[in-house]
Swiss-Prot record:
Coiled coil: none annotated. It catalyses: (S)-malate = fumarate + H2O. This is Fumarate hydratase class II. It comes from Photorhabdus laumondii subsp. laumondii (strain DSM 15139 / CIP 105565 / TT01). CDD domains: Fumarase_classII (cd01362). It is found in: Cytoplasm. Its main location: cytoplasm. One of its GO terms (molecular function) is fumarate hydratase activity. Its EC number is 4.2.1.2.
Length: 464
């Protein structure tokens, strides 16, 4: 039987594995919430450690925490950030909706490890108290939303936005490279008037430009931190300078523009900042799904589909059909976009379900948010590296389909009118004629007039 030690909390003593740094409240959570396999995200754990580091530093500066205890807490928090205690944070996402148990998990680990750093022991005889020292000037109700925002801003700024910019540039470069390749357009999955391949791809690049702005515009609200609001937003048990100072300290530690929330009641009672920001992520998912679907449709074939572009052939596509290659990057990214959209529904429900002074859907909200960021960042990187950079035009196929399109007849609208142009197109379709043959049979224009007026390369912009 594994060795244990006795830890105590306000509910009494409880056995805890002797080789673990966590304490009584973490152990109770482990025993009471054996639900699924999802654990609190590492990014959130690191954000909690950063929050404790900042709080200890400010509490020392304000004379509220003895120097040696504060320095030990900071040293222990740095160890967590360095990845030295990965097994000490075992709690499920599906716990108290305020994240209290994960806050106490961090408090207990830092208290026990800090005690060891000071030469003491872990357990009830430790030299640092998880509540009185590590959690000084704090409540789970302001710590956990603060850590959520810190984790979200870091994930967006350092992981997602760089990948989004790279993919946008790839598409913008492709748009420029293929700006002179005239192809047929399609609306309603039917033939439409011409455009260039560059123009089509430029639309994809512009979508991502807008997505980037929407995401960046959401970040300032997420940079507002609840820390200093304590239990219900009033700041009970905090120094008057604490809230501003601790936000400034977190900004220094992370190099991100964190500020104290101007209204702590909003910061505790809602998840509005993350609801709004994730809405921008959902918008990005919608754009990426559209782009990936367009790519795989345009690359369909190779002989019996549209086949206007080629994409990299990365791996065999079938266990029974030799030589088959599939648009697997497009399939992977559209699946993850669907997951992000599902995450958004759950986040919306969580955001709408806070009662009175505290939202209690927080662990689910931040888990879904961070999963969406990770999926989108990884998905864009994979799609860019293994698909987008390798998009190439199939010029012969593009020319073939362009010349077969009946919608080139639109160029005649300004010369013979809509009704006669429609008659030409319908006759050509019904009798299997070219547009020129149909127009000449109907006697609406000469061959020379047709050649002068129906020029696909002149149909990709406004009238000159």
């Amino acid at each position: 039987m594994a060795a244990t030690r006795i830890e105590k909390d306000s509910m009494g003593p409880i056995e805890v594995p002797a080789d673990q740094l966590w304490g009584a409240q973490t152990q109770r959570s482990l025993e009471h919430f054996r639900i699924s396999q999802e654990k609190m995200p590492v990014a959130l754990i690191h954000a909690l450690a950063l929050t404790k580091q900042a709080a200890a530093s400010v509490n020392m500066d304000l004379g509220l925490l003895p120097q040696e205890r504060g320095e030990a807490i900071i040293a222990a928090a740095k160890e967590v950030l360095e990845g030295k205690h990965p097994t000490e944070f075992p709690l499920a996402i599906w716990q108290t909706g305020s994240g209290t148990q994960s806050n106490m998990n961090m408090n207990e680990v830092l208290a026990n490890r800090g005690s060891e750093i000071l030469g003491g022991v872990r357990g009830s005889e430790r030299l640092i108290h998880p509540n009185d020292d590590v959690n000084k000037s704090q409540s789970s109700n302001d710590v956990f939303p603060t850590a959520m925002h810190v984790a979200a801003v870091i994930a967006l700024s350092e992981h997602l936005i760089p990948e989004l910019k790279i993919l946008q540039k790839t598409l913008a470069d492709k748009a420029e490279a293929y700006k002179d390749i005239v192809k047929i357009g399609r609306t309603h999955l039917q033939d439409a008037t011409p455009l260039t391949l560059g123009q089509e791809i430029s639309g994809w690049a512009a979508m991502l430009t807008h997505n980037l702005k929407h995401i960046e515009d959401s970040i300032p609200h997420v940079c507002e931190l609840a820390l200093g609001g304590t239990a219900v937003g009033t700041g009970l048990n905090t120094h008057p300078e604490y809230a501003v100072r601790v936000a400034k300290k977190l900004a220094e530690l992370t190099n991100h523009s964190f500020v104290t929330a101007p209204n702590k009641f909003e910061a505790l009672a809602t998840c509005d900042a993350l609801v709004h920001s994730h809405g921008a992520l959902k918008g990005l998912a919608a754009s990426i799904m559209k782009i990936a679907n367009d790519v795989r449709w345009l690359a369909s074939g190779p002989r019996c589909g549209i086949g206007e572009i080629s994409i990299p052939e990365n791996e065999p596509g079938s266990s029974i059909m030799p030589g088959k290659v599939n648009p697997t990057q497009c399939e992977a990214v559209t699946m993850l976009c669907a997951q992000v959209m599902g995450n958004d529904v759950a986040i919306n429900i969580g955001g709408a379900s806070g009662n009175f002074e505290l939202n209690v859907f927080r662990p689910m909200v931040i888990n879904n948010f961070l999963q969406s960021v990770r999926l989108l960042a990884d998905g864009m990187r994979s799609f860019n590296e293994h698909c987008a950079v390798g998009i190439e035009p199939n010029r012969d196929r593009i020319t073939q389909l362009l010349n077969e399109s009946l919608m080139l007849v639109t160029a005649l609208n300004t010369h013979i009118g809509y009704d006669k142009a429609a008659e030409i197109a319908k006759k050509a379709h019904k009798e299997g004629l070219t547009l020129k043959q149909s127009a000449m049979k109907l006697g609406y224009l000469t061959e020379a007039e047709f050649d002068e007026w129906v020029r696909p390369e002149d149909m990709v912009g406004s009238l000159k």
